[in-house]
């Protein structure tokens, strides 16, 4: 049975806090680009951009990023054949930009590592920062978020699920013991 950790209002407050932190830690927001990791990271990135627009009256580009080709745990039947890299995946130029990579949950760090590999194939940003709604710990790689909505310590046998209205039809963050 899932236990609710954050409701929709708490999620919005966490995203607003992240937005303020982004403004405070950057000298201006003109060079920012949000890249959301599919699926729910894209919706969170769009919300951050919208909130930033409300606060600073500036349009920040948002692009979705599919990291499935870059995962180190995906099955490749023919190990001699490298996956085809879609360098035109982003519809915005990230070269010389400050990219804020957005994801819903940070766990082992493997998804973020895959996203970093993908981004480096698509351009050369001046800086990459990581914003996550939930950091649940248990890192397997030396990856640390720059902006965190909520730290939620978990056990390895628990699952954290983020639901967003745009995709799931409701909003909350739940934790489930498997």
UniProtKB/Swiss-Prot annotation:
The keyword Transcription regulation applies. Keywords: Glycosyltransferase, RNA-binding, Transcription, Transcription regulation, Transcription termination, Transferase. Its EC number is 2.4.2.9. Pfam families: Pribosyltran. One of its GO terms (molecular function) is RNA binding. It comes from the Bacteria. It is an enzyme of class 2 (transferase). It catalyses: UMP + diphosphate = 5-phospho-alpha-D-ribose 1-diphosphate + uracil. One of its GO terms (biological process) is DNA-templated transcription termination. InterPro entries: PRibTrfase_dom, PRTase-like, PyrR, PyrR_bifunctional. A motif (PRPP-binding) lies at residues 99-111. Regulates transcriptional attenuation of the pyrimidine nucleotide (pyr) operon by binding in a uridine-dependent manner to specific sites on pyr mRNA. This disrupts an antiterminator hairpin in the RNA and favors formation of a downstream transcription terminator, leading to a reduced expression of downstream genes. Homodimer and homohexamer; in equilibrium. Belongs to the purine/pyrimidine phosphoribosyltransferase family. PyrR subfamily. This is Bifunctional protein PyrR. It comes from Limosilactobacillus reuteri subsp. reuteri (strain JCM 1112). The gene is pyrR.
């Amino acid at each position: 049975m899932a236990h609710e950790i954050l409701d929709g209002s708490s999620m919005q407050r966490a995203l607003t806090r992240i937005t303020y932190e982004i403004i405070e830690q950057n000298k201006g927001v003109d060079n920012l680009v949000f890249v959301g990791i599919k699926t729910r990271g894209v919706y969170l990135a769009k919300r951050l951009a919208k909130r930033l627009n409300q606060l600073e009256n500036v349009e920040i580009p948002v692009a979705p990023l599919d990291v499935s080709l870059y995962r180190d745990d995906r099955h490749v039947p023919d190990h001699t054949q490298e996956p085809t890299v879609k360098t035109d995946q982003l519809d915005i130029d990230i070269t010389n930009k400050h990219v804020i990579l957005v994801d819903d949950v940070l766990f082992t760090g493997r998804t973020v590592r895959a996203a970093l590999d993908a981004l480096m194939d698509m351009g050369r940003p001046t800086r990459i920062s990581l914003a996550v709604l939930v950091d649940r710990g248990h890192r397997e790689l030396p990856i640390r978020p720059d902006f965190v909505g909520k730290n939620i310590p978990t056990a390895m046998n628990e699952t954290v699920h983020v639901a967003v209205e745009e995709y799931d039809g409701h909003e909350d963050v739940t934790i489930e013991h498997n």
